[in-house]
Amino acid sequence: MDRLWAGWRYAYVSGLNEGTDVQSSGAPVDGGDGRTLFEVLADGDHGDEETFVVHRGPTCFAVLNVFPYTSGHLMVLPRRAVADLSGLTDEEYIELWATVRDAVAAVETALDPGGVNVGVNLGRAAGAGIPGHLHVHVVPRWSGDTNFTT
């Protein structure tokens, strides 16, 4: 194969080329009312099935990425908008990493990948699409895949 193309990421990539952060609908990543997209998802007003939220805990939740690097790409994040790890309370920190552990186990059980990437992009320069709201990526990987982008 000469080229691997993740067509489902086109709206995201083309939005970056235009200097705009977009979600699957092409809308900005904020909620239109000063909240980040993740804060809107955390509130749960739009229904979990419609917004791809797969788990809710007291301080954190998990959501399928609408621009997945691979099938099964999840994000785990605190409900509260926090830019980096040092801004988390102890309760949020513990639940975040416990949820990441559970997300990895779920991905491994459901998809049987050859491995899993777990990563956090802290700040726009590090690749964070929504730098004001920490999120941990859980990305299933298979031998020979080359579609990992940050």
Residue map of PLM features:
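A short glycine-rich, hydrophobically flanked beta-strand micro-motif that places a catalytic Asp/Glu
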Residues: 111-126
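Active-site microenvironments that recognize anionic phosphate/pyrophosphate groups
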Residues: 1-71, 76
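Long, well-ordered alpha-helical scaffolding segments within enzyme catalytic domains
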Residues: 89-113
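Short acidic, glycine/proline-rich loop/turn micro-motifs
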Residues: 86-89, 149-150
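Histidine-centered divalent-metal-coordination microenvironment in nucleic-acid enzymes
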Residues: 73-78, 96, 123, 127-148
